[in-house]
Amino acid sequence: SDYNSEVVTAALAIYGNNKKYDEIENNILPYFNPVKHGPHATSNVLKYLKISEKYEDALYLIKNVSSLNWNQFTNEFIKYEDEFIQMKKNYEAANTNTNSGSKVLSISRPIWSNNFKNPTWALNMAEKTKPSLLILPFTNIGETSTSFPKELSIALPLFLNDELHYSSNLKYHLALTYNDKEFKVPKNNYNTDYIDYIKAQNPDLDYILSGNILSKWDKEDNRYELEVYIYDTNISTKTTLLKEHVDENSIVDLLPKLLNNLNLFFNGLIDFKTFETPDVENILLKPKKLEVLMDLDGYSRDRSWAYNKILYNAVNSVIESENDSARFDLVSLLHQIMQIHPQLLSKVKPLIYNLVGNGYFISEKSSKLLPLIFSIYSDEDNYNNFVESIRRGNPDYIEWINKFLYYTSNE
């Protein structure tokens, strides 16, 4: 343990390359300290644990170091998480006979409200009216050499779900099919037989919104053809809302056009506010984020670095956006992290309190999240400053916030 990080990293690499695993087990691991020896040495330890198939030790180590400020290594540790979780799944599958099929998630609320104790006071609770609309995942047709089309197939419907919730009273739902691993991306166009089947199951359904992402990728321009359309189930006609070539840089520039065309189609029934061009990473991360928050595979407690990435993305979204939804997104995530990955809270606390101190939670809605932030961090002094404002809140808000407060004020 007296050796510095460079020596330990080199020793691990040499022993590993020469397959001297007993040397690692006997001479390195008993003295290994990730805080002292750093991320590179930790990575080499994880390589050894992978070879020796010690997935429990590896996942414990990965979770332990997620509390450290090693954010530049986030993607590397997420990769390790995925590998060791898969190893754990394989072991557990060999000892069980579980076989879960596909399920359907139907939502018409922002994804931040998932597992956030039904915050009706912060949602659009107006009565939904016709026409009725069903949003389906976009099809992803053709071979691709990047993850962009697959991510976009689910991310765009989730983006539209969030926008429509706040900006319209349309009777709409987003339907996503998923298994115990991920959301399913359709590989073929929706045919008329399938649409007729949906209509037969939902006689009051007026429209289906979906799209196709045609993967004619070539390394010179790295673009894909995106088509977004609405299908009228009553007269069996298709209207194209958008048809463009897109890549990761241009997709956000097309979103205002898509929203405008959608509003025109519905004759102004959708009241989109001033549109902020979001960070493309924030949009493309939506599917993975929802998969983690829903704990599709039951291993979210082992995904500390996945949560770490989502958390810092949520912080950046608050900085870049004036939208209240970004604030709710962050605080709902902090609430879930407190329950399953509390080790992440301390390192992000200075950022959270800087956001509070610099006025990022001053709108009428977002300011009501402050007591929850202070409660998460057991900050009784700041919490007490908001006691009276809580008592003056509307009944729905008071009932909701009381579900989260983990101690009682001294007042």
Regions found by a protein language model. Give the residues of each.
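Generic helix N-cap/helix-start motif at coil->alpha-helix transitions
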Residues: 2-10, 21-24, 35-44, 322-330, ...
